[in-house]
């Protein structure tokens, strides 16, 4: 790894050096039962405890020598580079919030510019803006009066603490993702401004393997780096096959790339199998946690450069078990550790609470949720070192330690 790289991730298990998190904010307290479906939540976490749990997560990372960065802080610092950038950010944020009324747009621009501190402004954008907070706004237009019942001008963004999905670090570049739903696609604006304008990343020659303006969807939970040569991507409830092809073309044909193969895993389209990383994560060189429902046989498509057609892909279908596919492409024996030990009831319960969603901070060393005690005991018996974090409230969002983190730098294996 070059020391001047702003980003470097070539595996799932290389020692973690720098990670991006988002500490849950007031957006959680703007959730109501009526908004759960709209905002893609199943329950309402208790913010005070969720923050305590998240702080324990961050402290665990720091104690392991990991530099912890926060999305909200980097976003605020990125727009401090110039007033032009800040105004562009505000305008784009309002447009993507779906604000139709011109009078309302003007009121929001004035409101956001009233914050003397950019961090406070970003926090408010993430939390959501209620109509009653715009003190000088009067509901005079037909649009505003007809839409008077809904309380928010800008919806809260409660999924932000799952920083894995809006973008993903691959090699020394990123996929700036187009999320499946409008609710979550708004989240990617923060990464856009961070990687284009923050002093830490600006001018660092960071390639974008995928862009948020693409029309098909791609989410970071479906992107797993199996080695410096092999990227796995799930074709799932949230990621389209067309997106996998776009990503593969850019990644495999980039002049400085180490990647040679993209493996597209077709997984069941359901809430429990939302992303590839909800059913399958790497914990050591040869060990993976899996949901029993993903062991296969699976449909997997190997995408490689077409030697006879420059710029095109060769797509090879393989139908085999997960173990055999991993063994073939990683060239080693593989141990699959089943969530819940394979017990049907325990596996379903612990899978619902992300028992298969671990974050490796080094080979054979992972962070896990305390509530998945059966899976955790099995991992320990397999020689995996565990860092167990509290999870009663964080887990209500249906994401585990991997979902809540975006590695920016890992040591190469």
Curated annotation (Swiss-Prot):
The protein's superkingdom reads: Bacteria
Signal peptide per UniProt: none
Q: Under what name is this protein listed?
A: Arginine deiminase
What are the subcellular locations of this protein? Answer: Cytoplasm
Q: Which residues form the active site?
A: 403 (amidino-cysteine intermediate)
Q: Which organism is it from?
A: Clostridium perfringens (strain 13 / Type A)
Pfam families named in the record: ADI
Query: Family assignment?
Result: Belongs to the arginine deiminase family.
């Amino acid at each position: 790894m070059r020391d001047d790289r702003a980003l470097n991730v070539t595996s799932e298990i290389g020692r973690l050096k720098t990670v991006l998190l988002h500490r849950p904010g007031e957006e959680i307290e703007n959730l109501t039962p009526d908004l759960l479906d709209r905002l893609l939540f199943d329950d309402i976490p208790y913010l005070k405890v969720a923050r305590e749990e998240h702080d324990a997560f961050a402290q665990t990372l720091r104690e392991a020598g990991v530099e912890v960065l926060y999305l909200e802080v980097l976003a605020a610092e990125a727009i401090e580079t110039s007033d032009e950038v800040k105004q562009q950010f505000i305008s784009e944020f309002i447009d993507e919030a779906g604000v139709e009324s011109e009078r309302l747009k003007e009121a929001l621009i004035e409101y956001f510019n009233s914050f003397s501190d950019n961090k406070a402004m970003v926090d408010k954008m993430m939390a959501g803006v209620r109509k009653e907070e715009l003190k000088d706004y009067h509901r005079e237009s037909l649009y505003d009066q007809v839409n008077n019942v809904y309380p928010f001008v800008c919806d809260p963004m409660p999924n932000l603490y799952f920083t894995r999905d809006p973008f993903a670090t691959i090699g020394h570049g990123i996929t700036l993702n187009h999320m499946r739903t409008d609710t979550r696609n708004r989240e990617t604006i923060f990464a856009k401004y961070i990687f284009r304008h923050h002093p830490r990343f600006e001018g660092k020659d960071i390639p974008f393997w995928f862009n948020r303006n693409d029309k098909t969807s791609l989410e970071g939970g479906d992107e797993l780096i199996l080695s410096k040569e092999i990227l796995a991507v799930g074709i799932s409830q949230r990621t389209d096959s067309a997106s996998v092809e776009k990503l593969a073309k850019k990644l495999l044909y980039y002049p400085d790339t180490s990647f040679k193969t993209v493996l597209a895993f077709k997984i069941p389209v359901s809430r429990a199998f939302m992303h590839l990383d909800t059913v399958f994560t790497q914990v050591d060189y040869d060990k993976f946690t899996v949901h029993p429902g993903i062991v296969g046989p699976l449909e997997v498509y190997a995408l490689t450069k077409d030697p006879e057609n420059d710029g095109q892909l060769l797509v090879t279908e393989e139908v085999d078990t997960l173990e055999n596919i991993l063994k073939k492409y990683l060239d080693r024996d593989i141990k699959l550790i089943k969530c819940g030990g394979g017990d049907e009831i325990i596996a379903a319960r612990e899978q619902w609470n992300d028992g298969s969603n671990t974050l490796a901070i080094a080979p054979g060393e992972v962070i896990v949720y305390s509530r998945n005690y059966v899976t955790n005991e099995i991992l320990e018996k397999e020689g995996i070192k565990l860092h167990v974090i509290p999870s009663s409230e964080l887990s209500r969002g249906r994401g585990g330690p991997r979902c809540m983190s975006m590695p920016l730098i890992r040591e190469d294996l």
